[in-house]
C-alpha cells in the first residue's frame, strides 16, 4: 500500500468496515490443478471482531478447509481440479475495530525507558521468539547503525517508536514494484526505496536488533478519499506494519503498533488479518499450479469502506 496523505485523523468509537479483497490469476494456457493457501480472514481480538466472512473461489474447489496456526491466524486451503485459465479468489469481510485503550501510547510501558520492554521472566517467555533474527540473518551492522539514533539510552518507548517510524518515512521512498517478497532488509537499506512490507520489516529488524520483541502484521488500512472526491472502488491494498510487545500489569501484555509507511502509530483504522515473525508467516495467498502456461498475470483489488449492515449479501 502506498503512503497516503488523505488518511483521516484518528476516529473515536468502534468502527465497522466491509472489506472486499479480490485476486485474479490469468494464465496463457490451461491449468489442470491449483493448490492454494491464504491468510484472508480478519482475526478476532479484544479490539477487533470479525462479524462475518465469506471466501469465494472460482472455479469452485474440489477440496477446501480452514485451520488456525500457532499464532492464532486463520488459514484457508483449497484445491481446484477443474481445468481453468482464470482463477479468482474473493474475500468479503465485515469487521468491527475499536480504538486503542486509553493511555496505550500515553502512559505505562509506553512512557517507560524502551529497555524495560525487553522480554524477561515468565511473562515475556512467549514473546522471546519475536526477538530472534531470521534466516538468512537480517540484523546486520548496517541495521544496527541505522537504528541507533532512535534508541537513545532510557528514551521512552513511544518516543522510540515515533522516531523510528518517522525516520523510515522520511529516509525511504515508497515505490511500487521496486522490490519483491524475497528482497532483504539490507537491500532496502541500500536502495532507500520499497513498499509497506519492506518498511515494516526494516522497523522490525531495528527493534529486534535492540532486544525488543517485534512482529510483522498484515491486514488492511481504511483510508478516506481526498476532500470533494468520491471514494473509488478497489483502490485500497493489503497493508503491513510492525508491532512491539510490551509487558503490562498484572501479567498482561500489549502490542504497540507502528506504521512507518504512513508515519503514525496504529489505531482503529487498521484491520488485522495476520501476525507472525515475518511476511512468510502470513502471506495473503500462495500456491502451486500444474500447467504448461509460460505466462501469467495477477490483478489484485481491495476496498475498505465504512459499513452499517451486519450480513454479507451477494
From Swiss-Prot:
Keywords: Acetylation
N-acetylserine, modified sites: 2
Tree of life domain: Bacteria
InterPro entries recorded: Bac_transglu_N (IPR013589), Papain-like_cys_pep_sf (IPR038765), Transglutaminase-like (IPR002931)
Keyword Acetylation in annotation: yes
Record-annotated membrane-spanning stretches: none
Any one annotated GO CC term: plasma membrane
SMART domains: TGc
Keyword Acetylation: yes
Family, similarity comment: To M.leprae ML0607.
Entry protein name: Uncharacterized protein Rv2569c
Source organism of this protein record: Mycobacterium tuberculosis (strain ATCC 25618 / H37Rv)
Amino acid at each position: 500500500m502506498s503512503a497516503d496523505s488523505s488518511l483521516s485523523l484518528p476516529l473515536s468509537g468502534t468502527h465497522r468496515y466491509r472489506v472486499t479483497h479480490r485476486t485474479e490469476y490469468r494464465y496463457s494456457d490451461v491449468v489442470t490443478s491449483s493448490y492454494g493457501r491464504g491468510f484472508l480472514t480478519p482475526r478476532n481480538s479484544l479490539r477487533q471482531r470479525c462479524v462475518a466472512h465469506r471466501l469465494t473461489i472460482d472455479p469452485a474447489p474440489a477440496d477446501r478447509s480452514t485451520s488456525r496456526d500457532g499464532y492464532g491466524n486463520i488459514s484457508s486451503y483449497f484445491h481446484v481440479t477443474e481445468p481453468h485459465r482464470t482463477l479468482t479468489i474473493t474475500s468479503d469481510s465485515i469487521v468491527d475495530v475499536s480504538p486503542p485503550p486509553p493511555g496505550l501510547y500515553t502512559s505505562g510501558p509506553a512512557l517507560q525507558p524502551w529497555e524495560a520492554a525487553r522480554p524477561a521472566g515468565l511473562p515475556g517467555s512467549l514473546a522471546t521468539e519475536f526477538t530472534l533474527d531470521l534466516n538468512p540473518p537480517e540484523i546486520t551492522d548496517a541495521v544496527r547503525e541505522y537504528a541507533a539514533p532512535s534508541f537513545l539510552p532510557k528514551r521512552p518507548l513511544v518516543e522510540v517508536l515515533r522516531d523510528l517510524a518517522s525516520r523510515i518515512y522520511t529516509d525511504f521512498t515508497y515505490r511500487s514494484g521496486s522490490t519483491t517478497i524475497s528482497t532483504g532488509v539490507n537491500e532496502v537499506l541500500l536502495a532507500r526505496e520499497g513498499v509497506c512490507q519492506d518498511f515494516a520489516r526494516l522497523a522490525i529488524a531495528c527493534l529486534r536488533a535492540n532486544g525488543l520483541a517485534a512482529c510483522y502484521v498484515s491486514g488492511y488500512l481504511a483510508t478516506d478519499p481526498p476532500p470533494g472526491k468520491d471514494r473509488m472502488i478497489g483502490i485500497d491494498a493489503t497493508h503491513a506494519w510492525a508491532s512491539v510487545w510490551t509487558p503490562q500489569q498484572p501479567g498482561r501484555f500489549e502490542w504497540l503498533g507502528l506504521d512507518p509507511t504512513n508515519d503514525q502509530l496504529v489505531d482503529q483504522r487498521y484491520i488485522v488479518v495476520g501476525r507472525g515473525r515475518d511476511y512468510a508467516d502470513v502471506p495473503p495467498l500462495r500456491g502451486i499450479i500444474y500447467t504448461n502456461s509460460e505466462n501469467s498475470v495477477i490483478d489484485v483489488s481491495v476496498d475498505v469502506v465504512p459499513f452499517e449492515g451486519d450480513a454479507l449479501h451477494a
